[in-house]
Amino acid sequence: MQTDRHLQSAGRAPGRSINYRRRAEIFRWLHRAVILAGSLAVMLVVLSPVAWLVSSSFQNEAEIVSVPPHWIPDQPTLKNFKAIFAATGDETVTYETRNKQDPASGDYIPSTAGNLLPAMANSFIVATLVVILNLLVGIPAAYAMAKIRFYGRNGSIYFILTTRVIPDIALVVPFFLVIKNLGLLDHILSLVITYLAITVPFTVFILIQYFEGLPDELDKAARVDGCSRFQSLTRVFLPLAMPSLVAVILFAFLTSWNEFLLALMFTQTAASQTLPIVLASFTSDFTISFSFINAAGLLAIVPPVIVAIVFERYIVSGLTAGAVKG
């Protein structure tokens, strides 16, 4: 009897193991399907506004405001982009001098449209200067705090981190007083100075964690070979810190390119205004050209997208390396 039971249980064991494997495989595929569906839903929410921005940039005003909206333009046009690049010409039609046509035709542009390209140049200059100065200040500071032991080192690191706890809007008045005393109101250098105060703490924090994760033997070996502190930093540590450097470069560039509040406070004329300020000025108390604003917005996101695509493979690794010690 016992022998028969053992034979029966042995005969059922392979079937049970097959069922378990099938269940595990089904659960694995269901898990993947849920992750895929969630990823597609998030991607749809994130990319839908961008897709509409691109599509509406090639539509006229009447098609943009039509119901239901046209995700694919019926009659694609480049008129909006031509108006941007011809905004300073004799054919400019402004809110004040627009033709006696139906405003829905989109045959008018804002009176401040001629400031768009200079504002893009100002934004690029400010972002580039902030990135360069950010690296010149942040790299030596992070290296010193990570590899040189001195009194007050930990307190300095915590102080740098606490500066990012303060919201930017609380710093507007102190920044304004400093910029006014320096005589830099309505000058792009005012934005460079304030953006450095915002981005340098992040740069120092990320690079400190990365430099601390590198073994001290690298520094000692470089010193034995006759390298100074500066040579050890530039020849040994910086090449290894490239992912984190790219991450802080992107953060500084995108922050400077997109910042609105401080630029609104410190710039008044087209000579110093950046792109977000000029884009905000395209609205009027009486009417608005969605087609023109969308085309200008599409041009505004091109440089950051190009920078992000070029350095995309460094972004995640750089932020991860700076977020985890060791």
Model segments located where?
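A structural signal for multi-pass alpha-helical bundles of membrane permease subunits
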Residues: 11, 23, 32-326
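Short, Lys/Arg-rich, polar N-terminal cytosolic tail immediately upstream
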Residues: 1-26
